[in-house]
Amino acid sequence: MYINIFHYVLREDCDVAAYHELSIAMYEVVTKNAEYEFVGMERFGDDYEGVVLETFESLEGAKRWSRCPEHRAAMKRGRAEFYERYEGSGTVVDHDYQFDRAQLRSVDQFE
């Protein structure tokens, strides 16, 4: 599994509605194409600054997404119209874990 971490700050004069429309369009592209091995996305922040965590099955899938023509055009538009600045990083997940209280039969299982 591979996670891309993207932190952005939008320009003060940014058309936030247009930015969100473009984000939705890119989400539709990445989710409809199995070649990108997209797992999911979490977004945190407000209208002008945020962090996006994108999860892919593999680094290779994330690289294919970074080369997607629609995504490349969106990145170019983002630099021209929306972003004041951004930074990204990625990491391969070496382990993961989960907890789901609903799957327990009783609280006694915690002890």
Name every feature range the model reports, one short phrase each.
Residues 1-50, 59-67, 83-111:
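Short S/T/G/P-rich N-terminal loop/turn motif that feeds into the first structured element of a domain
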Residues 75:
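Metal-dependent phosphoesterases centered on the DNase I-like endonuclease/exonuclease/phosphatase
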